[in-house]
Regions:
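Amphipathic alpha-helical repeat scaffolds of TPR domains
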Residues: 69-78, 178-182, 244
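Helix-start (N-cap) detector for alpha-helical repeat units in TPR-like alpha-solenoids
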Residues: 1-2, 35-36, 69-70, 106-107, ...
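Residue-level recognition of tetratricopeptide repeat
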Residues: 9, 43, 77, 114, ...
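Core solenoid repeat modules with strong leucine/isoleucine-rich periodicity
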Residues: 57, 61, 66-76, 91, ...
Length: 244
């Protein structure tokens, strides 16, 4: 049985999902109650863009082994990503169960944050994101979502610290640079720093429309109207090339 699972795992890593699917289904003929096989079938379904069926397999794995860590995590992620609010309580319970089983897994806390944020429990979500970051200081998604959560709650100055930590570890994080530039433009009013954020994006992505637009706004705020006008003309050309 383990040979089937190992072969399926290798095929899955090689992105040969149809062959992996066939191997796992063959394995079911020998052991229909093997939780790992059902879990792996769920992974294949997710890889193939069939999340509903993937969730069914993950649920079956949990029926056979209620403490299957990977199935607990991935089923909760699928529920959250599919936008199934009627199953959020189930996903929340699975993540809390997994938190006790794997207290050092930062992804558990992050996904608790995402789930509770979707449910509008913003204070609780903030706490989960912060716990995820304690466990993994360079956790890209947790740092950005914490900053975004704070900014959306009209707490932009508090969002600066997680953004700085994000950019310390991931200096080319475009969304982080956009958000930090916006905060420095509209709240801190340090236009030179905001300008530098957008230049950093444009160095690697010259055609990034939002970064260039925000740079135009900075130049208007600085009174550099000629530069701003030229900047807007460049945006028009970029949009024309995108739409044509």
């Amino acid at each position: 049985m383990q040979a089937y699972i190992n072969r399926g795992d290798v095929l899955l890593k090689m992105n040969r999902t149809e062959e992996a699917l066939a191997v796992y289904k063959s394995a079911l003929n020998y052991d229909a109650t093997n939780h790992d096989i059902h879990y792996n079938l769920g992974v294949v379904a997710l890889e193939q863009g069939r999340p509903d069926q993937g969730l069914q397999y993950l649920n079956r794995a949990l029926e056979l082994d209620p403490q299957h860590k990977e199935a607990l995590l991935n089923s909760a992620i699928v529920i959250q990503e599919l936008g199934l609010p009627h199953l959020h309580q189930l996903a929340h319970g699975r993540l809390l169960q997994l938190k006790d089983l794997a207290p050092e897994n930062e992804r558990v806390f992050f996904n608790l944050g995402m789930l509770t944020m979707d449910d509008g429990n913003l204070e609780e979500a903030e706490g989960w994101f912060k716990k995820a970051i304690i466990l993994k200081k360079d956790f890209r998604s947790a740092l950005f979502n914490l900053a975004l959560l704070l900014a959306d709650q009209d707490r932009p100055l508090e969002a600066v610290a997680p953004l700085q930590q994000l950019l310390e570890h991931h200096p080319d994080h475009v969304k982080g640079l956009i958000l930090l530039g916006d905060i420095y433009t509209n709240h801190i009013r340090d236009l030179d720093f905001a300008e530098s954020c957008y230049f950093r994006i444009l160095e690697s992505e010259p055609g990034h429309v939002q970064a260039r637009h925000n740079l135009c706004v900075v130049w208007v705020e600085k009174g550099q109207l000629e530069a701003a006008q030229t900047c807007l003309e460049v945006i028009c050309l970029l949009l024309f090339s995108i739409l044509s």
